Amino acid sequence: MAQPGRASLKEQRYDRQLRLWGDHGQEALESAHVCVINATATGTEILKNLVLPGIGSFTIVDGNRVSGEDVGNNFFLQKSHIGQSRAQSATELLQELNNDVSGNFVEESPETLLDNDPSFFNRFNLVVATQLSESTVLRLAELLWNSNIPLLICRTYGLVGYMRIIIKEHPVVESHPDNALEDLRLDKQFPELTEHIQSYDLDHMDKKDHSHTPWIVIVAKYLTKWFNEKSDQLPKSYKEKEAFRQLIRQGILKNENGTPEDEENFEEAIKNVNTALNTTKIPRCIEEIFNDDCCVNLTEQSPSFWILVRAVKEFVANEGQGCLPVRGTIPDMIADSSKFIKLQNVYREKAKRDIAAVGNHAAKLLQSLGKAPESISERELKLLCSNSAFLRVVRCRSLSEEYGLNTFNKDEIISNMDNPDSEVVLYLMLRAVDRFYKQHGRYPGVYNYQVEDDIGKLKSCLTSFLQEHGLSVLVKDDYVHEFCRYGAAEPHAIAAFMGGAAAQEIIKVITGQFVIFNNTYIYSGMSQTSATFQL
């Protein structure tokens, strides 16, 4: 009896997030092990936002001792921790937020681990690097890229926040698009739907049945009338749709005085004309996924995602007759329970048949690849079929490509420099301060008495960076002055914001839900704006 109670308690604790990513998303989160390098203000804020929703386990890698500066900007460290292990202190306090989460720490610098035990990082589902030097992050990124482990770089520098996601390929099954259109198939009706619609006779119904007929049926009925009397094409223009709405409006029952009755289901049908008349077609992004080399040329190493995508493609070419599997859901509407459930079951049963057909194609593909039939679960199959119109594949460039002189994405920088205050300027400044660090062993402005001297040095670093990369862009001196004044500080307000944003992207990667940005995110605390760039 303890188990149901515990599950109930868990559902209560995680109720809001379960509504976002479901039980399967929560399971993925609870089985994940994330490594965070450096228990800085940014690092602990990221972990706070992973521990609270129930990440399975985390490991902090940090060889530093707690300093007064740490206590000043990190709410997870106290004055009594000064001189103690920063990794251990942060881990102990973070674990207090959620007893279900396992916290670990390693009192080593990332540089030491990269030198002596690089395979250490292979045990994690995802690695987060915070406040690392350029040379270290390049080494780490190369290692993880070759091991196919996602890396998220997160940095707070004064009033600037920076994130970079590095992941070779990230398929998203549940992208949860905003304003997704319903999959009603009124323009390409399957036989069972046509038969169900024909079972209604709006002209010979009593008032109660007439006013409780689902709006989908009403639109379908008048669509048939439109085809017979007006045109063999769906109403497309505003004028045609207004004419179609008027056709439906004429079907509202009238009382003995000739006044139209108050039939909310007909008003609902009129309101949903645009939704109902949506053309059933395969989205361009799905066509691109079907034509992707990973879909066309399957191998024994192909992950389940690509095998299922290929199975859906085979379905479209055969049973689907050019259409994706039916989603199997309909929106709530005004109708009596019996009529609504019958209509709902028509769509659900069609979705089940489509899933079974895709499953048959998947089984044949698995057999041809020499893989076990159970290597793809029923849940995976159902999930991908019901989301087949919303699939996404994100591929990020490696960090070495971004930093290479011959592979640097110069066009992306130039195209975003029309505005001299674009967030991309902040990216250029971050590259400049990293160059400053490489040359001087410290960041500009870390000592107050050197701020003025560092302005010229930082400007020189920026100029040389722009010249080396062939960037004929103008960066205002104000930014050079500002970055020197920052002194590489890590204000908690910015760190907290970046911690929330980074945790959100990490959860997207782990659950395979919602679409991650590709590939660089810059936040400006000065203007309270942000932007993403594909660098």
Swiss-Prot record:
InterPro entries per UniProt: APP-BP1, ThiF/MoeB/HesA, ThiF_NAD_FAD-bd, Ubiquitin-activating_enz
MF term (GO), any: NEDD8 activating enzyme activity
Region ranges (Interaction with UBA3): 332-345
Name listed for the protein in its UniProt record: NEDD8-activating enzyme E1 regulatory subunit
Pfam families to which the protein is assigned, alphabetical: ThiF
Residues at the site labelled Interaction with UBA3: 212
This protein's UniProt keywords: Ubl conjugation pathway
Native species: Gallus gallus (Chicken)
Subunit: Heterodimer of UBA3 and NAE1. The complex binds NEDD8 and UBE2M.
Pathway: Protein modification; protein neddylation
Family under the similarity heading: Belongs to the ubiquitin-activating E1 family. ULA1 subfamily.
Domain of life per record: Eukaryota
GO biological process: protein neddylation
Gene3D superfamilies documented for this protein: NAD(P)-binding Rossmann-like Domain
Keyword Zinc appears in the UniProt entry: no
Function: Regulatory subunit of the dimeric UBA3-NAE1 E1 enzyme. E1 activates NEDD8 by first adenylating its C-terminal glycine residue with ATP, thereafter linking this residue to the side chain of the catalytic cysteine, yielding a NEDD8-UBA3 thioester and free AMP. E1 finally transfers NEDD8 to the catalytic cysteine of UBE2M. The covalent attachment of NEDD8 to target proteins is known as 'neddylation' and the process is involved in the regulation of cell growth, viability and development.
